[in-house]
Amino acid sequence: MATPRRAQLDDKTDITGARVVIVEARFYDDIQDALLEGAKTELDAAGVAYDILSVPGALEIPAAIAIALDAAKKNGRPYEGAVALGCVIRGDTIHFEIVSAESARGLMDLSVSRSLALGNGIITVNNTEQAWERARADDLNKGGDAARAAIQMIRIKRKLAKP
């Protein structure tokens, strides 16, 4: 495995009051617990409030985010961002390719069409060992990476919104 390099982002744009929705696919509970913990740790450290919604699988994540965004806006407590968390492990059929590609496409469509600060933490791997390499509780946790991405995108949105 190549050594990952994380960009050091020094953006200190104020994100006070930021609120995101985490939507997690509970298909692999133990791996999902680790991804969720990584995301929560990063959001808590940044002072970002969050709500958590659980769905059965990765394909349901984009729709659940869209539903959450609409409901939160209607209720007067809109989300500034979202964190998508899940795990898709390759099997013997093309289901892996479909779920991986379509969940990513759905998230990208949401992000672009709604200018949504989105962190994609849906890991797509060949086996359980690779999943744990990306979910373990350290600097490689992809749940934490997804939360950091959403936080940075919120900073960018706020910075560009300033007069």
UniProtKB/Swiss-Prot annotation:
The record's section on CDD domains has: Lumazine_synthase-I
An individual GO BP term: riboflavin biosynthetic process
Q: In which pathway does it act?
A: Cofactor biosynthesis; riboflavin biosynthesis; riboflavin from 2-hydroxy-3-oxobutyl phosphate and 5-amino-6-(D-ribitylamino)uracil: step 1/2
Please list the reactions this protein catalyses: (2S)-2-hydroxy-3-oxobutyl phosphate + 5-amino-6-(D-ribitylamino)uracil = 6,7-dimethyl-8-(1-D-ribityl)lumazine + phosphate + 2 H2O + H(+)
- Listed binding positions for 5-amino-6-(D-ribitylamino)uracil are 27, 58-60, 87-89, 120
Query: Recorded E.C. number(s)?
Result: 2.5.1.78
Q: Which InterPro entries does UniProt cross-reference here? A: LS, LS/RS, LS/RS_sf
**Per the record, GO CC terms?**
cytosol; riboflavin synthase complex
Question: Catalytic residues?
Answer: 95 (proton donor)
What are the UniProt keywords, alphabetically? Riboflavin biosynthesis, Transferase
Q: Which residues bind (2S)-2-hydroxy-3-oxobutyl phosphate?
A: 92-93, 134
GO MF terms listed in the record are: 6,7-dimethyl-8-ribityllumazine synthase activity
Which positions form S-S bridges? none
Q: What Pfam families has UniProt attached to this entry?
A: DMRL_synthase
The record's annotation in HAMAP family points to: Lumazine_synth
Protein family membership: Belongs to the DMRL synthase family.
Q: What does this protein do?
A: Catalyzes the formation of 6,7-dimethyl-8-ribityllumazine by condensation of 5-amino-6-(D-ribitylamino)uracil with 3,4-dihydroxy-2-butanone 4-phosphate. This is the penultimate step in the biosynthesis of riboflavin.
Its recorded name reads 6,7-dimethyl-8-ribityllumazine synthase
The protein's gene is named ribH
